[in-house]
């Protein structure tokens, strides 16, 4: 009535207002982000039951891995774990490729966003040597992982290969990284989200994969393995002893455990 119009036309930036009510308390907030922060923006393609980017990053952070040390994901799926590792190794800000809802708001000067994004790009370390290897038996998974790595800007930092990881482990080829003999004196790191639940195949294939891991770890005692799974049998079937550490986590709504097997310190 004040403006003598029926409705206001939509114009300008979008302000996503969220209202929550708990008993007698009302909270009104503005969403400055847009899509959830666990979405880095690089995952354009995925396979069944992909692991969240934030969970993959946490798995890498809780391991012994650092830039320059060999990291292998033998069940890489759409590549989330190796991609997150590569981004951490390059010191890339998690949301470096994202655009946020508040960037269109007049209250925040565009120059501030530009300056912060510039600082984030300047902080990227392109010189650290990265030895990251990702395998999967599924051709479509490898193709998706390679596309996602390219979108994240780390395509050249990860060596992807379609392969049967059980066979690689049993043949010892996980340590024979390439023709130049790219090995790690400290012992490599396996970080993986093996098949289970929606991702599980037939029991025989899973048993064969576990047997491959078990054989590889026996033959390479300085290697460490970090695996997330709801399958409590992994301690017996892979490690043949209790894990050095366990952490209860959630992969989506599924309760899982992050099993940490620490390899022996290499002899001087």
Please report, for each region that a protein language model flagged, where it lies by residue.
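Residue-level recognition of the N-termini of beta-strands and the immediately preceding loop/turn
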Residues: 13-15, 128-132, 157-158, 188, ...
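Short loop/turn motifs enriched for small/polar and acidic residues
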Residues: 20-22, 77, 163, 230
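Conserved S-adenosyl-L-methionine
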Residues: 51-168, 198-199, 205
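C-terminal catalytic and target-recognition region of SAM-dependent MTase-like enzymes
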Residues: 164-167, 171-268
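Beta-sheet entry/capping signal
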Residues: 25-27, 68-71, 131, 189, ...
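Non-catalytic, mostly N-terminal accessory regions of nucleic-acid modification and defense proteins
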Residues: 1-53, 60
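Alpha-helix capping and helix-loop boundary segments enriched in small/acidic/polar residues
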Residues: 46-50, 76, 250
């Amino acid at each position: 009535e004040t403006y003598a119009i029926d409705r206001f036309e939509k114009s300008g930036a979008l302000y996503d207002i969220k209202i929550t009510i708990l008993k007698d308390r009302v909270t009104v907030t503005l969403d400055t982000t847009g899509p959830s922060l666990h979405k880095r923006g690089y995952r354009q393609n995925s396979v069944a039951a992909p692991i969240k980017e934030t969970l993959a990053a946490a798995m890498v952070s809780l391991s012994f891995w650092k830039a320059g040390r060999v990291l292998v994901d033998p069940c890489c799926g759409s590549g989330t774990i190796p991609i997150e590792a590569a981004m951490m190794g390059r010191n890339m800000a998690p949301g470096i490729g994202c655009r946020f809802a508040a960037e269109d708001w007049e209250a925040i000067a565009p120059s501030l966003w530009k300056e912060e994004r510039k600082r984030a790009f300047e902080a990227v370390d392109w010189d650290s040597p990265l030895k990251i290897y990702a395998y999967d038996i599924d051709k479509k998974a490898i193709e998706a992982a390679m596309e996602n790595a390219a979108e994240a800007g780390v395509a050249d930092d990860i060596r992807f290969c379609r392969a049967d990881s059980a066979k690689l482990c049993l043949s010892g080829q996980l340590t024979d990284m390439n023709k130049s003999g790219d090995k790690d004196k400290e012992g490599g790191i396996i970080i993986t989200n093996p098949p289970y639940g929606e991702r599980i195949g037939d029991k025989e294939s899973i048993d064969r994969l576990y047997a491959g891991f078990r054989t590889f770890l026996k033959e390479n005692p300085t290697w460490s393995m970090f695996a997330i799974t709801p399958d409590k049998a992994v301690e017996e079937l892979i490690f043949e002893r209790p894990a050095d550490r366990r952490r209860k986590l959630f992969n989506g709504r599924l309760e899982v455990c992050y099993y940490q097997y620490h390899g022996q310190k290499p002899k001087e």
